[in-house]
Curated annotation (Swiss-Prot):
SUPFAM superfamilies: ATP synthase (F1-ATPase), gamma subunit (SSF52943)
Organism field: Shewanella sediminis (strain HAW-EB3)
Name the UniProt record assigns to this protein: ATP synthase gamma chain
Membrane topology: Peripheral membrane protein
Pfam family membership, one: ATP-synt
Similarity-based family: Belongs to the ATPase gamma chain family.
This protein's encoding gene: atpG
One GO MF term attached to the UniProt entry: proton-transporting ATP synthase activity, rotational mechanism
Length: 286
């Protein structure tokens, strides 16, 4: 058994760690609320953009945009959104597991893959995982802007336009609630047809001035909005996961302190008992 002094030092060390994790929990809680507000503000735009694009895709178009045409999948791209920092539980690990499983399934069918990681953890993972990394972005901070993503996203769009990619997916952690974040893989291109649009009647649109120009702009904005929404959803998920992880660490530190305090008391008791025994033995010898 360690002596009382060593145990006391250990208790002090764990208490200091507990203060740090408790502070990190409070910071994460504050950042999570801001991230939730940002996510809630952008979600209606992303959802309505998806509905509009899905509805347009069902119309009888004079011009058929390449983003609406399904072609044989020979090479697919993944835009994978992760965190820049760690200490957020298994958030990134679960996301990477889902991507790896999907990539394995694609490769078994003879499909090649390439990646566009967003977030330092994603960049680090895919550099070591293997596979072509065509573009990346990191260091977006706690208030990411669409302008910071446009260049990266357009690298993947250019590859799709040139026929180098036949499918494009975005992967991120969807924020469900504080205790639950779900990794999802959503197809961006070719444009997936929503179930609502499939059962509703189709509309014919009159385009002014030109359907090609309109769709070129609208579809690019659609892809950018979906990727941005994935980034802000992932940020809210990150702060929620970090808050939960730090709360768990703080609670575990408290349990460890209680256990160490018990060991310390036993060590003190043993030391005092030994001293008394030595005194009694010395007195008996005299």
């Amino acid at each position: 058994m360690a002596n009382a002094k060593e145990i006391k030092t250990k208790i002090a060390s764990v208490k200091n760690t507990q203060k740090i994790t408790s502070a990190m929990e409070m910071v994460a809680a504050s950042k999570m609320r801001k991230a939730q507000d940002r996510m809630a503000a952008s979600r209606p735009y992303a959802e309505n953009m998806r509905k509009v694009i899905g509805h347009v895709a069902q119309g009888s178009l004079e011009y058929k945009h390449p983003y609406l045409e399904v072609r044989e999948a020979k090479r697919v791209g993944y835009i994978v959104v992760s965190t820049d920092r760690g200490l957020c539980g298994g958030l990134n690990v679960n996301l990477f597991k889902k991507v790896v499983a999907d990539v394995k399934s694609q490769r078994e069918q003879g499909v090649e893959v390439e990646f566009c990681p967003i977030g330092a953890r994603s960049v680090q993972f895919f550099n070591s995982f293997g596979g072509q990394v065509s573009a990346y972005a990191s260091g977006l901070g706690d208030a990411p802007k669409l302008a910071d993503l446009i260049g990266t996203v357009r690298v993947m769009l250019q590859a799709y336009n040139e026929g180098k990619l036949d499918r494009l997916y975005v992967v991120f952690n969807r924020f469900v609630n504080t205790m639950s974040q779900t990794p999802v893989i959503e197809q961006l291109l070719p444009l997936p047809k929503s179930e609502v649009d499939e059962v509703s009647h189709h509309w014919d649109y009159l385009y002014e001035p030109d359907p090609k120009e309109l769709l070129e702009t609208l579809l690019v904005r659609y892809v950018e909005s979906q990727v941005y929404q994935g980034v802000v959803e992932n940020l809210a998920s990150e702060q929620a996961a970090r808050m939960v992880a730090m709360k768990s660490a703080t609670d575990n530190a408290g349990d460890l302190i209680s256990d160490l305090q018990l060991v310390y008391n036993k060590a003190r008791q043993a030391a005092i008992t030994q001293e008394l025994s030595e005194i009694v033995a010395g007195a008996a010898a005299v």
